[in-house]
Amino acid sequence: MKLSSAFVLSAITVAALGESITTTITATKNGHVYTKTVTQDATFVWAGEGAAVTSAVTEASTVAATSAAAETSVAAETSIVEPSTSAQGTSADEGSGSSITTTITATKNGHVYTKTVTQDATFVWTGEGERAPASTVATVETSVAAETSVAEPSTSAQGTSADEGSGSSITTTITATKNGHVYTKTVTQDATFVWTGEGERAPVSTVATVETAASPVTSVAEPSASTDEGSGSSITTTITATKNGHVYTKTVTQDATFVWTGEGERAPASTVATSSISAIEIPSTTEASIVEASSAVETSSAAETSSAVETSSAVETSSAVETSSAAETSSAAETSSAVETSSAVEISSAVETSAVETSSSSSTIETTSVKSLSPTQTSLSSSVQASSPIETSSAAKTSSVVPTFSSTTTENSSNSKSTSAVVASTTTSSESSATIVTPTRIGQAYTESSSRDAQSVRTHESNNWSSSSSASTKMVSSITRVQTTTAGIFTNGKSSTTPQIVNYTGAADSIAAGTGLMGAALAAVIFL
């Protein structure tokens, strides 16, 4: 209902007579149409609505159409309606002399009221926050479709209405998406509800909700505390709310495993857009130590074929029984048959140092040296076994193994061969580098270097030289072993010192003794 200035003047006269006027008011609020029949005294001033009551006494005492007091009667108006085209001022009535006649709208207990008010151009409707002056004074309506945030905050921007909880309410459905699931909730609130505590506000030119496409949460519901914070995966979401005709946005960062609690009943939607969070699995590089039982057939440069079956256990006290059978053809077209049985009890002690270990991958590289023969002489045969557990890690390790054992050998051979190989090795993360050291024998020294994969098992290393005499029978004896040390710098840039076993000390004396015995035996046979 529009009240003109003339009608207001006549209403004062009617008020003096104690008469009243009955009016039906119709207005639209949030897409809903409200009607109400009001019976009031002609001089009725609607007060008690909080900060918007700027000069109720003025309207009660005077009917000046240019007074801001007339506007007081719409104090319950929510801020969805722009009150006027007036410039922002600091007073309800600057008294500039320039006035504007405007139809303003107010909401009271869920109903919208309209009234025609003539007010000063500098009139400021207080208590409603910042306003953008409108070019027209027609009621600004906000449809429900334009708001995708939670329930309309309030039908009364004042928040101090004397009639809150009067029974007039608005029911709103809130929708939110969380972790690929859609949740809905129905909220019923009083029409005078005021939504506060939303943080920074950014008024925009339109009331349409501003949303971010990447946001998994489309509602204004404030996320609760995560039940699994610190998982390392987070989602940043911009949530939007509409308040008093303005759109406010807020940025929230939450953990990807966030659980939305305290929101009441939830109804997962039938269509669920799955939101998957890809995780990069870091496989474990820790491997169990490898204990290998290997059988290898290897042909040497001197056409030697050997078959070795060995069972070893690294980084522990191990007992190994090795049986080796070899059939050889020498460069002098002589054949030899050697049957060797060695019993070895080996105590391996591995001392490892590493800066940072990320894996434990053990492999055993073993070098076996069998036979130490001299042509036409009875000699000793020794078996040297060096077992080094090789560990692969991100920081190269240096391992040292000192084997100790005794060996007894009986051989018949027409081929003179002196072989001794001791392996000193270390590895990087993918390869092992081994240096085979052979002591000087009869003025000749033999060495060999090789690089191999850390998983390989080397069963036999030997150096051979041709024989120059006929067959001889060898006596069984023991050889004093002297420990020497060989140092080398390998591919990983670290130096390694590995104790070695050299088997030739005292060999000359034994050979001499064997030669004398053989000569006596031969003389006896010839004599017979």
Swiss-Prot record:
Region of interest (Disordered), ranges: 79-100, 145-172, 214-234, 298-471
Propeptide: 507-528
Region (12 X 6 AA approximate tandem repeats, Ser/Thr-rich): 289-359
The Sequence repeat ranges on this chain: 20-98, 99-168, 169-233, 234-274, 289-294, 295-300, 301-306, 307-312, 313-318, 319-324, 325-330, 331-336, 337-342, 343-348, 349-353, 354-359
GPI-anchor amidated glycine lipid attachment residues: 506
GO biological process: siderophore transport
Post-translational modification: The GPI-anchor is attached to the protein in the endoplasmic reticulum and serves to target the protein to the cell surface. There, the glucosamine-inositol phospholipid moiety is cleaved off and the GPI-modified mannoprotein is covalently attached via its lipidless GPI glycan remnant to the 1,6-beta-glucan of the outer cell wall layer.
Residues engaged in binding ATP: 488-495
GO CC annotation terms, alphabetical: cell periphery; extracellular region; fungal-type cell wall; side of membrane
Signal peptide start and end residues: 1-18
Gene Ontology terms for molecular function: ATP binding
Transmembrane segments: none
Bias-annotated ranges (Polar residues): 81-93, 145-163, 446-457
Residues covered by region (4 X approximate tandem repeats): 20-274
Subcellular location: Secreted, Cell wall; Membrane
Induction info: By iron.
Domain remark from Swiss-Prot or TrEMBL: The number of the intragenic tandem repeats varies between different S.cerevisiae strains.
Functional summary from the UniProt entry: Involved in the uptake of non-siderophore sources of iron and the siderophores ferrioxamine B and ferrichrome. Has a role in the retention of iron in the cell wall and periplasmic space.
Name of this chain's protein: Facilitator of iron transport 1
Native organism taxonomy: Eukaryota, Fungi, Dikarya, Ascomycota, Saccharomycotina
